[in-house]
Amino acid sequence: MSLPNSTTVLPFLARLWQETAEQGGNVSGLARKSQLRDDSKLEALYILMVLGFFGFFTLGIMLSYIRSKKLEHSHDPFNVYIESDAWQEKGKAVFQARVLESFRACYVIENQAAVEQPATHLPELKPLS
């Protein structure tokens, strides 16, 4: 069967597809997919349920962590120490004391002969070659 032009091919293919679909014979993948659309709604519902469960689980962990941070006692000595600036002032004082100690530990050794007689020639060691 030969068709003379392409305009007659489209109605021929449409009629052939309708006959095949009505007979329930060998149906293309697109036709099979249209029959299973009801099941795809259940798949989407399953995915949404799983995501919702993990979202709820994550939200619960996050809220319990935030709640535990709020329950810290404000009269706890460690929290009072951190909230105050006393530790910063003490840290500055300790740093300044260490700087002063390092300056005291440094000293210069003078050669008195070189200071008293700067014009005198100092002897040098000669190599033994």
UniProtKB/Swiss-Prot annotation:
Pfam families according to UniProt: ISK_Channel
Modified positions (Phosphoserine) in chain numbering: 102
Tissue and organ expression note: Restrictively localized in the apical membrane portion of epithelial cells.
Record's subcellular location: Cell membrane; Apical cell membrane; Membrane raft
Regions crossing the membrane: 44-66
Modifications made to the protein after synthesis: Phosphorylation inhibits the potassium current. N-glycosylation at Asn-26 occurs post-translationally, and requires prior cotranslational glycosylation at Asn-5.
One Gene Ontology cellular component annotation held by this UniProt entry: apical plasma membrane
Major site of localization recorded for this protein: membrane
Domain of life assignment: Eukaryota
Keywords: Cell membrane, Glycoprotein, Ion channel, Ion transport, Membrane, Phosphoprotein, Potassium, Potassium channel, Potassium transport, Transmembrane, Transmembrane helix, Transport, Voltage-gated channel
Membrane topology: Single-pass type I membrane protein
Positions annotated as glycosylated: 5, 7, 26
GO molecular function: delayed rectifier potassium channel activity; potassium channel regulator activity; telethonin binding
Keyword RNA-binding (UniProt): no
Cytoplasmic compartment segments: 67-129
GO biological process: cardiac muscle cell contraction; cellular response to cAMP; epithelial cell maturation; heart contraction; membrane repolarization during cardiac muscle cell action potential; membrane repolarization during ventricular cardiac muscle cell action potential; negative regulation of delayed rectifier potassium channel activity; positive regulation of potassium ion transmembrane transport
Assembly behavior: Interacts with KCNB1. Interacts with KCNC2. Associates with KCNH2/HERG. Interacts with KCNQ1; targets the complex KCNQ1-KCNE1 to the membrane raft.
Family note: Belongs to the potassium channel KCNE family.
Summary of the function given for this chain in its UniProt record: Ancillary protein that functions as a regulatory subunit of the voltage-gated potassium (Kv) channel complex composed of pore-forming and potassium-conducting alpha subunits and of regulatory beta subunits. KCNE1 beta subunit modulates the gating kinetics and enhances stability of the channel complex. Alters the gating of the delayed rectifier Kv channel containing KCNB1 alpha subunit. Associates with KCNQ1/KVLQT1 alpha subunit to form the slowly activating delayed rectifier cardiac potassium (IKs) channel responsible for ventricular muscle action potential repolarization.
Full protein name: Potassium voltage-gated channel subfamily E member 1
Native source organism of the sequence: Mus musculus (Mouse)
Name of the coding gene: Kcne1
